[in-house]
Amino acid sequence: MKKELLIFGSNGALGKGVTKVLLQKDFDKIYLFDFDLTNDKISMNKTVNIQVKDLTKEENVITALSQIKPDKDIYYFLFSTIGGFWGGETIWETKYEDWNRMINLNLNTSFLLAKHFSWLVKASAGGSICFTAAFTAENPEGMKGAYGASKGALIHLVKTLAIEGQKINLSANAISPYIIDTPANRSWTPDADFSRWIKPEEIGEIVYSLFSNFSYISGNVITLKDRFKS
C-alpha cells in the first residue's frame, strides 16, 4: 500500500522544519501547499508544489485538494500549520472583525480541510489528519481570548472527526505547542530561555509518529510545552 502526504503551510516557519523531516520519511509522494512558493520551492522526485489561495473560501480548498485523486491502494495523510495569532486585548476591547479573523484563520480553514480531505480518504484506503492547535486552547490566558477560543474549537473539531472518522478509516489528532522555536518568536521574547522551546523539526518527528501509528492513535491532543532544563 502506498502512502502519500499533504502538508499545508509548508513554507512557513513551522512548515519548513516539519517538511524537512518528513521529506526523509517513507512517503511515496508529498504534496506541498502554500500561498507563496517562489523562494523556497522544493524540487524532488516525490514532491509536488501547489500554490493555494485564501483557504477560508471553500472553493479554494476544493481546488487545492482536487489535484489529488482518490485511490483504494493509497493511504493519505495531511498535516496543517494553517492559522494565525492575534492577541493583546481583553474581551471587551476585542473588535468583532478581529474575533472573526481568528475564527476564520484557525477554525474555518481547518473545518474546510477536514471536510474535503475526509471525502478523499473515504474514497481511498484510509488515512490520518493532524492539525496545529495551541497550548492556550486548553489553558486559557488573558489577552488571548479570540485566539484561544478559535484553537479550542479546533480541538473539538479534531475530537469529533476522530469519532466520525472510524467509519471511513480516518484518524485525527492535533499538536498543541506553547512556544515553537522560530526566528519570529525569538525576536518577540529575546530574554527567554530558547533551549526549552520545541523545534519545528521535533514537531515533524511527532507528526510522523502519529502517522506511523494512525490506525489506532486518534482523538489525541499532544501538548508541547517546555522541555526539561538540562
Where are these regions (language model features)?
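Substrate-binding pocket helix/loop in short-chain dehydrogenase/reductase
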Residues: 75, 89-91, 98-103
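Catalytic loop of short-chain dehydrogenase/reductase
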Residues: 83, 122, 128-153, 158-167, ...
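Active-site "substrate specificity/gating" loop of NAD(P)-dependent dehydrogenases
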Residues: 94, 140-144, 185
